[in-house]
């Protein structure tokens, strides 16, 4: 029985359109309800079914171009390590992530315990895609200790609460993964706005992340903003994060808005070095990080 084009989506590579163009040799008509059922999933649904010992295939709505959204891959790598570390594993304190190559197909996660001490455990997770290393993540898990050293000189930007700002639509050219988050600009600039100060400042939250470890959910959200340097551009260009270092400052609460700030301090030779800070709704700094980003412009 022929399919009704009005109830189908045209798929070629990873592009989806509700109205099919002239159909070529590589075109396929698939019912929209089938696409939504098989290729769309919330973060909560992903982690409900994720088994670190089995290959993982990312849904279409978590792709960033042809590759899997880096925040999701990092969160899955952390979750795999936490499962392997057991119930006595202390909370994550720091992580160093290298995006070695593209994760374009099914992913396989291999966690390893490097050292387990009284208060510090060091682990790695390697993620493979198409038999090639796609991500290498080193994690340090620490138990808190009594200390006479106590200070906090961090300062949250002067912003109002999330409801005081309007929701921002990233637009049709944004990658699929961008639509899994709610975003409310609270200052700084917008992507591709030709700004002179490369800084993004937005309240961000997951669409659906119930039942996920709060730190795992935070890692999945922490990379939700595009690199700050693209605020200086006026047109879309290819981007690729190479390294990501992060430190957990305070334990995040589940299912809330977070204030994300990313700033590019140096950009030259096709690479941008950017800092990121994340605060909770109550004003606590929960994460600090730095990324090296390749910009093809």
Each PLM stretch: what is its role?
Residues 32-297:
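Terminal targeting signals and extreme-terminal segments of soluble enzymes
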Residues 12-15, 36:
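Low-complexity, intrinsically disordered or signal/transmembrane-proximal segments
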Residues 24-26:
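Residue-identity detector for glycine
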């Amino acid at each position: 029985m022929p399919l009704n084009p009005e109830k189908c989506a045209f798929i070629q590579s990873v592009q989806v359109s509700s109205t099919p163009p002239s159909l070529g040799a590589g075109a396929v008509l698939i019912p929209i309800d089938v696409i939504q059922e098989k290729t769309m999933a919330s973060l909560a649904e992903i982690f409900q079914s994720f088994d670190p010992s089995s290959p993982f295939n990312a849904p279409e709505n978590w792709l960033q171009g042809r590759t899997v959204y880096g925040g999701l891959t990092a969160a899955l790598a952390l979750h795999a390590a936490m499962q392997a570390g057991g119930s006595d594993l202390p909370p994550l304190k720091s992580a160093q992530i290298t995006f070695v190559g593209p994760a374009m197909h099914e992913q396989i996660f291999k966690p390893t315990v490097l050292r387990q001490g009284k208060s510090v455990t060091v682990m790695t997770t390697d993620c493979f895609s198409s038999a090639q290393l796609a991500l290498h993540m080193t994690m340090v898990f620490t138990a808190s200790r009594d200390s006479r050293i106590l200070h906090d000189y961090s300062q949250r930007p002067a912003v109002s609460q999330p409801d005081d700002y309007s929701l921002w639509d990233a637009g049709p050219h944004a990658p699929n993964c961008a639509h899994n988050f709610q975003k409310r600009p609270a200052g700084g600039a917008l992507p591709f706005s030709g700004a002179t100060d490369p800084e993004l400042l937005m309240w961000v939250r997951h669409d659906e992340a119930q039942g996920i470890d709060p730190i795992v959910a935070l890692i999945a959200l922490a990379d939700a903003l595009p690199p700050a340097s693209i605020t200086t551009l006026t047109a879309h260009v290819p981007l690729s994060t190479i390294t990501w270092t992060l430190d957990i400052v305070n334990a995040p609460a589940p299912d809330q808005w977070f204030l994300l700030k990313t700033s590019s301090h140096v950009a030259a030779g096709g690479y941008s070095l950017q800092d990121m800070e994340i605060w909770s709704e109550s004003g606590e700094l929960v994460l600090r990080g730095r990324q090296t980003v390749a910009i093809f412009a």
